Design a protein with these regions (language model features):
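Helix N-cap at the start of a conserved alpha-helix in ABC-type nucleotide-binding domains
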Residues: 179-181
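Conserved ABC ATPase signature
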Residues: 143-147, 151
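H-loop/switch region of ABC-family ATPase nucleotide-binding domains
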Residues: 203-204
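Catalytic Walker B motif of ABC-type/P-loop ATPase nucleotide-binding domains
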Residues: 168-171
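A short, surface-exposed alpha-helical micro-motif characterized by mixed small hydrophobic
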Residues: 209-211
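Conserved ABC ATPase "signature" region
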Residues: 121-139
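Helix-to-loop junction immediately C-terminal to a conserved catalytic motif
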Residues: 67
Length: 252
């Protein structure tokens, strides 16, 4: 998980401006098989970007490449004025199944703050803010492993957001959650968005995409088929693949 850099006084800071993110002629191959092909797009600060597509379209793979967990076979991923090293420190990623420490709820956030060199005297306020926004402050002393699935995902989000990353990648963050837990996660994402963090996420849930997306990247068979404002995509899709997907038809 990439986090913000910290100045000598121990304060989190937003160094170079990351956005826009520009992806150009991106390819990714494994064992001679091309999984992502000729993908190009630009996304700016502000709009929430939702990556849609059927299973196997390459959605999660695209997020991992943009986050720097994987290296492209060809093409470029460029972050405005930030070097790759700075970019990694100014972004975070949360996965479908949260990976939490076998410690208390609060200690999971303490850990990332300590890694970033935040002085102990400043951590408490940052931990309290993150847990409060996630609705987890009353559970601060509880072991993370006894939290419900929805609470664990909110903890993963709170931990990722504690240092105010400029960009937050989310890979199917509510795929295994019930409607109530999904609603709580979406409310937290709304708050994170309102603080200025850019959200780029994948989802299979068309209802969720309609609720959250400001712009849509639609992938099919490893290719970017459509990139459009959410309203335009849902009201007037341009490709036969997107039309079929929105109609609930199976794509392969």
């Amino acid at each position: 998980m990439g986090l913000l850099s910290v100045n000598p006084g121990g304060h989190a800071m937003r160094p170079a401006v990351l956005l826009p993110l520009v992806v150009q002629d991106l390819y990714y191959e494994i064992g001679g098989k091309c999984l992502l092909e000729d993908i190009s797009f630009r996304t700016d600060a502000g709009p929430r970007t939702v990556v849609l597509g059927p299973n196997g379209a390459g959605k999660s793979l695209l997020l991992r490449l943009c986050h720097g967990l994987l290296q492209p076979s060809a093409g470029t991923i460029a972050w405005a004025w930030a070097t790759p090293e700075v970019a990694r420190r100014c972004q975070a990623m949360v996965f479908q199944r949260p990976v939490l420490l076998r410690r208390s709820t609060a200690a999971n956030i303490t850990y990332v703050l300590r890694l970033q060199g935040i002085p102990r005297r400043q951590r408490r306020a940052m931990i309290t803010e993150a847990l409060e926004q996630a609705g987890l402050l009353p559970l601060a002393a509880q072991p993370a492993r006894v939290l419900s699935g929805g609470e664990q995902q909110r903890l993963a989000l709170a931990r990722a957001w504690a240092l105010k990353p400029q960009v937050l990648f989310l890979d199917e963050p509510t795929a295994s959650l019930d409607p109530a837990a999904t609603q709580a996660v979406e409310a937290l994402l709304d708050h994170i968005h309102c603080t200025g963090t850019k959200i780029i996420m994948t989802t299979h849930d068309l209802g969720q995409a309609r609720r959250l997306a400001d712009e849509v990247l639609f992938l099919h068979h490893g290719r970017l088929v459509e990139h459009a404002p959410a309203t335009a995509f849902f009201d007037n899709p341009q490709s036969k693949e997107a039309i079929a997907f929105l109609e609930g038809k199976l794509l392969w």
